[in-house]
């Protein structure tokens, strides 16, 4: 009988390299927010991959970048703290973009903070380019990370090679116990997941300045008194400027209603019951650079 393996795997990379989509594909359900906008993951979300002979706990971090605000610095600190604590680092590099200074900077950060941690390079988004481009990117990634790191191409969207990624990550884990019971897919509280789902819906199709400026806080969650099958969820969406409030709400409140409809459908799946979702938008000026407001909003 093979020895049970378990441990923590951190997926890292530049913003928008497919880390959250890959987390969801590996776990088999939605535990991390995905958006076409970079820098949309704010919290370290753990997804859990269960198999008969191993358990992988995935830590999905924000994209590492050179910080411009206090929030950016805190997010980067979160990533570096994570590097030092995990068993394996999965470096995500997309197949459809040339390796650049950002990728090299991240490899330098990994080598400086976690030189002994096993590194696996994961070439993501292979469905977006022809096979010869994938092959060329594999060579370029090999030159970047060196001979000691294993390299795996994957498409989280089509599912191609997802099982291979799981096998490679599991093989690098140490022997250990199952940290979580079978069937548990994340250790994030439901309120955090609900806030992330609302945030994802609110970010869909909006201008570039909004992702960094939007925070969502769940204010109240209560079962409806006269109905067993309905839960009331009240959420606050915080932006930094009045102009951003207008973007979220839309003409005559149309966009906020769309956000509510999309988020409610996802929250109902998460909770397994009908949901009444009440969304309110507030302005918290320059919250990304204000330590007190960052703390109040959960950072």
Curated annotation (Swiss-Prot):
Ranges of residues in domain Era-type G: 5-175
Keywords recorded for this protein, A-Z: Cell wall, GTP-binding, Nucleotide-binding, RNA-binding, Secreted
InterPro entries: G_ERA_dom (IPR030388), GTP-bd (IPR006073), GTPase_Era-like (IPR005662), KH_dom-like_a/b (IPR015946), KH_dom_type_2 (IPR004044), KH_sf_prok-type (IPR009019), P-loop_NTPase (IPR027417), Small_GTP-bd (IPR005225)
Region feature (G5): 154-156
Region called G1, residue ranges: 13-20
Pfam families associated with the record: KH_2 (PF07650), MMR_HSR1 (PF01926)
Subcellular location: Cell envelope; Secreted, Cell wall
Function text: Exhibits GTPase activity. Binds RNA but is probably not involved in ribosome assembly in mycobacteria.
Subunit structure: Monomer.
PANTHER family assigned: GTPASE ERA (PTHR42698), GTPASE ERA, MITOCHONDRIAL (PTHR42698:SF1)
Descriptive protein name: GTPase Era
Taxonomic source organism: Mycolicibacterium paratuberculosis (strain ATCC BAA-968 / K-10) (Mycobacterium paratuberculosis)
Gene responsible for this protein: era
């Amino acid at each position: 009988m093979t020895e049970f393996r378990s441990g923590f795997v951190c997926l890292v990379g530049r913003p928008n390299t497919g880390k959250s989509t890959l987390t969801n594909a590996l776990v088999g359900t939605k535990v991390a927010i995905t958006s076409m906008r970079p820098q949309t993951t704010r919290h370290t979300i753990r997804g859990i991959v269960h198999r008969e002979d191993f358990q992988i706990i995935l830590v999905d971090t924000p994209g590492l970048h050179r910080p411009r605000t206090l929030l950016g610095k805190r997010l980067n600190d979160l990533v570096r703290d994570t590097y030092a604590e995990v068993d394996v680092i999965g470096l995500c590099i997309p197949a459809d973009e040339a390796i650049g200074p950002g990728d090299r900077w991240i490899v330098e950060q990994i080598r400086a903070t976690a030189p002994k941690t096993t590194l696996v390079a994961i070439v993501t988004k292979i469905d977006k380019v022809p096979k010869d481009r994938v092959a060329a990117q594999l060579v370029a990634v090999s030159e970047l990370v060196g001979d000691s790191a294993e390299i795996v191409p994957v498409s989280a969207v089509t599912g191609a090679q997802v099982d291979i990624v799981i096998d490679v990550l599991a093989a690098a884990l140490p022997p250990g116990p199952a940290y979580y019971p079978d069937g548990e897919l994340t250790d994030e509280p439901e309120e955090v997941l609900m806030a992330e789902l609302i945030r994802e819906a609110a970010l869909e199709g909006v201008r570039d300045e909004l992702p960094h400026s939007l925070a969502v806080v769940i204010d109240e969650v209560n079962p409806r008194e006269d109905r067993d099958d309905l839960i009331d969820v009240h959420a606050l969406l915080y932006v930094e400027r009045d102009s951003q409030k207008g973007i979220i709400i839309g003409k005559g409140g149309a966009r906020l209603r769309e956000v509510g409809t999309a988020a409610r459908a996802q929250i109902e799946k998460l909770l397994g019951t009908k949901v009444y979702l009440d969304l309110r938008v507030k302005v918290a000026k320059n919250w990304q650079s204000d330590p007190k407001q960052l703390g109040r909003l959960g950072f």
